[in-house]
């Protein structure tokens, strides 16, 4: 998600300005989960990777830009689509229990399952997928969908965010979820300068008190924002409230930053002692997976601390890592399973050399002593 939104120069500035306390790694590799997504055919690469519970012992994975085909068969045997899904039976990293899905055309060619279809959709719009959650009141899964548009069809870097929608998948639906609904939302900032642009949907926390906390990112500083709404009012945007630094405000424009230097995808999870852990990639794109600890879902949050230093960029100067987040649904007691994405600034050249590059990596963080 937004993986190409920064040129190499901005990545360098991000690395130089990152503010996490750089200490030794406090996480460990989760090798079995990383190996789960190392595949030769069918789905063999994607970023994004969010998880939502979808019934008893069933987890929905969903991804943004996805590679489909034969990873060893050359470019003619590969297709990129803008999003895809997978269903895992159970909570263990078993290849036999994980099935990937995407839509298909009349001749069987892979197609994107979630395509913008709302009233304000323009030709050429596509979705990258944000955070999501299962809403037991509505008996549906909700996924934030960023509506993107390339200003120049010949330039992959010319994309812009034109709006944020909600994808609604009723419980019991069968992938690739052709029966889903789409709802336009007012939850994106459409300013004229980079510091005025942003959106909600980077992360979601469903609290026991009935509120759904939705995190947003704004500006070049990657400022963290938060909104909340009760589960029964998710589709009524007049009921959404935005934290302004002192109270919950009706005006989204009054949203106050909780922190800066986070990533376009992240997670907020409760800790056993009543605090909350925010997991993100320092500065959006960097080798550092970081955390902040907060006293409530809206903060205040403590300083950024390093969880893990990714090594992929040391292997190749074109590789970069981004958008770390936790997956509590798949985490063992007393720990958090965390993913991060790996990509290349020279994507199509590098994917030919290393077809296993473009897939999530996983680490495991022990919660004791945080």
Where are these regions (language model features)?
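Bacterial N-terminal signal peptides that target proteins for export
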Residues: 1-10
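Cleavable N-terminal signal peptides
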Residues: 10-11, 21
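Hydrophobic core register within WD40 beta-propeller blades
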Residues: 51, 132, 204, 266-268, ...
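Beta-rich catalytic cores
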Residues: 45-47, 127-129, 198-200, 262-264, ...
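Beta-rich carbohydrate-recognition and catalytic domains
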Residues: 24-44, 53-125, 134-193, 208-263, ...
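Short, linear, compositionally biased motifs with a strong N-terminal bias
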Residues: 14-15
